[in-house]
Amino acid sequence: MTELIDGKALSQKMQAELGRKVERLKEQHGIIPGLAVILVGDNPASQVYVRNKERSALEAGFKSETLRLSESISQEELIDIIHQYNEDKSIHGILVQLPLPQHINDKKIILAIDPKKDVDGFHPMNTGHLWSGRPMMVPCTPAGIMEMFREYHVDLEGKHAVIIGRSNIVGKPMAQLLLDKNATVTLTHSRTRNLSEVTKEADILIVAIGQGHFVTKDFVKEGAVVIDVGMNRDENGKLIGDVVFEQVAEVASMITPVPGGVGPMTITMLLEQTYQAALRSVSL
């Protein structure tokens, strides 16, 4: 029988523990982890994500500051705001919600964030730490998936992991984290030939392609572990993953649902990295 990897339950467990760690940090050092989230414009999906992050941060005892800015803000003005947060000792994590308006270069915005406060793990200095095998701030979705593997005792050593999607947010950092655990990794993308033949070789299949119900059971080997990173809306507005859950659950040994799988863990890892940044600030 297929086992459900319950990201919602794991995130609740981790956030409860995080709340206890935050309380200890406050008692011992007088520090409350501070997270600043910057939202530019009024993208509906981004607004939902930001509200969820804000709620989770407050529930875990964090200081949470959300700055909502007009879509017309200039790149220079946004960078100035980031620099102010870089200097603010009560803020330990800075997150700029993507996507940004077209007139703003997201790479320059990411570069403006102090790497020690880059809780999304997108700054080149943090990606460098990741590639060198000494990760500090790791992109939150891959970090959350690794926690799922730990919690559910998924053995990675020597296993063939196939990732669909090569983004800097999920695919590439996910590949590096799996390599660090001695998995054999294949990174596929939209130009990969005979994709379903490649994915059918996977012991572990991670799908982050951003196309609703793209992966059917024809893509999946019997007994594979399937992680669905997709967050899409169908024609009725229902939230669906990149995987046809009902089909793939027939052949997979373990699978994440959408919603309630990877999404909650992404937010939990954002908070965990903000807490770790606050903890590091104690010894500075």
From Swiss-Prot:
GO cellular component: cytosol
Metabolic or biological pathway: One-carbon metabolism; tetrahydrofolate interconversion
Its EC number(s): 1.5.1.5, 3.5.4.9
Catalysis: reaction(s): (6R)-5,10-methylene-5,6,7,8-tetrahydrofolate + NADP(+) = (6R)-5,10-methenyltetrahydrofolate + NADPH; (6R)-5,10-methenyltetrahydrofolate + H2O = (6R)-10-formyltetrahydrofolate + H(+)
CDD domains in the record: NAD_bind_m-THF_DH_Cyclohyd
Gene3D superfamilies, A to Z: Leucine Dehydrogenase, chain A, domain 1, NAD(P)-binding Rossmann-like Domain
PROSITE patterns reported in the protein's UniProt record: THF_DHG_CYH_1, THF_DHG_CYH_2
Any Gene Ontology biological process: methionine biosynthetic process
Coiled coil: none
Residues reported to bind NADP(+): G165, R166, S167, S190
GO MF annotations in UniProt: methenyltetrahydrofolate cyclohydrolase activity; methylenetetrahydrofolate dehydrogenase (NADP+) activity
Domain of life: Bacteria
Pfam families linked to this entry: THF_DHG_CYH, THF_DHG_CYH_C
Keywords: Amino-acid biosynthesis, Histidine biosynthesis, Hydrolase, Methionine biosynthesis, Multifunctional enzyme, NADP, One-carbon metabolism, Oxidoreductase, Purine biosynthesis
InterPro entries: Aminoacid_DH-like_N_sf, NAD(P)-bd_dom_sf, THF_DH/CycHdrlase, THF_DH/CycHdrlase_cat_dom, THF_DH/CycHdrlase_CS, THF_DH/CycHdrlase_NAD-bd_dom
Keyword Oxidoreductase: yes
Entry annotated with the keyword Transit peptide: no
Functional summary from the UniProt entry: Catalyzes the oxidation of 5,10-methylenetetrahydrofolate to 5,10-methenyltetrahydrofolate and then the hydrolysis of 5,10-methenyltetrahydrofolate to 10-formyltetrahydrofolate.
Protein family membership: Belongs to the tetrahydrofolate dehydrogenase/cyclohydrolase family.
Annotated NCBIfam families: PRK10792.1 (NF008058), PRK14179.1 (NF010776), PRK14186.1 (NF010783), PRK14188.1 (NF010785)
Assembly information from the UniProt record: Homodimer.
Name of the molecule in the record: Bifunctional protein FolD
Species name: Streptococcus agalactiae serotype V (strain ATCC BAA-611 / 2603 V/R)
